[in-house]
Amino acid sequence: MKILVTAFDPFGGENINPSYEVLKNLKDNIEGAEIIKIQVPTVFYLSVEKVIEKIKEVKPDAVLSIGQAGGRYDITVERIAINIDDARIPDNIGQQPIDTPIDPEGAPAYFATIPIKEIVEEIKKENIPASISNTAGTFVCNHLMYGILNYVHKNGLNIKAGFIHIPYLPVQVLNKPYTPSMSLGDMVKAIETAIKVIAKKSR
């Protein structure tokens, strides 16, 4: 079994992206699944293209994407991706689409196909705060989640896919008073727990 895990490069003036720091620290084999890791650019469309290329290359059983949600205090497992880009800030090459469909011929939205409630419950058993989120936003995180699910759906692929948002790392909030953060160790444990659930359910 293969699980493709994606993370983003830094964006929005940050020097690091916790999703990539987590990705680098994941084990290479979890619950008997080979973990294939890829960093993707925080760029509309290009991020999706990079992941689709990797899907074609490695033919994974599941794809789990991780992204930063600065301001959230817990691990948030996304329920749904919507067919819209509405960027509050530019992406990493200056694109800032407003009220733009991701795929004019695509479905209005797609639900995650990973077991979101079980993932949340298992993460909480590790004494790490977690919840289901009903919005992945309208920036590149939602864009990537939608793009992957859209590709899987249109091509009739038997690949589970979903997205998990994680908080800032403590080092990112040194000058952001009252902004929540989470330790790298807890975030790695949370994502590895999510992967264990996905691996069990994908067999």
UniProtKB/Swiss-Prot annotation:
Q: Which residues form the active site?
A: E78, C141, H165
Query: Top enzyme class of this protein?
Result: hydrolase
Disulfide bonds, paired cysteine numbers: none
The EC number of this protein is 3.4.19.3
Q: Which domain of life is it from?
A: Bacteria
- One Pfam family in the UniProt entry: Peptidase_C15
Q: Which GO terms describe its biological process?
A: proteolysis
Compartments (UniProt record): Cytoplasm
Q: Which GO terms describe its molecular function?
A: pyroglutamyl-peptidase activity
Catalysed reactions, as listed in the record: Release of an N-terminal pyroglutamyl group from a polypeptide, the second amino acid generally not being Pro
Matching entries from CDD domains are given as:
Peptidase_C15 (cd00501)
InterPro entries on file: Peptidase_C15 (IPR000816), Peptidase_C15-like (IPR016125), Peptidase_C15-like_sf (IPR036440), PGP-I_bact-type (IPR029762), PGPEP1_Cys_AS (IPR033694), PGPEP1_Glu_AS (IPR033693)
Going by the UniProt record, its keywords in alphabetical order are: Cytoplasm, Hydrolase, Protease, Thiol protease
Cellular component terms, GO, for this chain's entry? cytosol
Q: Which family does it belong to?
A: Belongs to the peptidase C15 family.
What is the stated purpose of this protein?
Answer: Removes 5-oxoproline from various penultimate amino acid residues except L-proline.
Which PANTHER family does the record associate with it? PROTEASE FAMILY C15 PYROGLUTAMYL-PEPTIDASE I-RELATED, PYROGLUTAMYL-PEPTIDASE I
Assembly mode:
Homotetramer.
Name assigned to this protein:
Pyrrolidone-carboxylate peptidase
Which species does this protein come from?
Answer: Thermoanaerobacter pseudethanolicus (strain ATCC 33223 / 39E) (Clostridium thermohydrosulfuricum)
